[in-house]
Design a protein with these regions (language model features):
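Amphipathic, Lys/Arg- and hydrophobic-enriched alpha-helical face
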Residues: 28-46, 63
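Structural recognition of an alpha-helix C-terminal capping motif at a helix-to-coil junction
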Residues: 37, 51-58, 62, 71-83
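Intrinsic, short, N-terminal disordered tails of RNA polymerase sigma-factor systems
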Residues: 1-7, 11-14
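A short, charge-rich alpha-helical start-of-domain segment used by transcription regulators
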Residues: 13-36
Length: 94
């Protein structure tokens, strides 16, 4: 997804912190490919990867206020995705 001129990642994240659904959708579309790539590495198949990706984004939006703006967003997102995939795997093994 290409951002509109003048709309920076930081601005999208800021609006996500205020609860803007439009900006949550923008963030989802912007990082969907990146998130799926990570999820596919930690999942058994594409359907599981899609569930991990969607669950991870739900966690991101619920906890976006805990994101530290001084660190790269992608690194934080990656951590959330990996932890979500591991949690799902543990749940499936039970």
């Amino acid at each position: 997804m290409h951002l509109r001129p003048g709309v920076a990642e930081e601005e999208i994240i800021h609006h996500c912190k205020t609860g803007s659904l439009k900006h949550q959708e923008m963030l989802y579309k912007l990082f969907y490919g990146y998130a799926m790539g990570i999820s596919l590495r930690y999942s058994l198949n594409r359907d599981d990867a899609l569930e991990v990706t969607n669950d991870a984004f739900i966690k991101v939006f619920k906890s976006i206020n805990s994101y530290n703006n001084t660190k790269p967003f992608k690194a934080w997102l990656r951590t959330v995705i990996i932890n979500t995939a591991i949690d799902r795997r543990r749940k499936d093994l039970k």
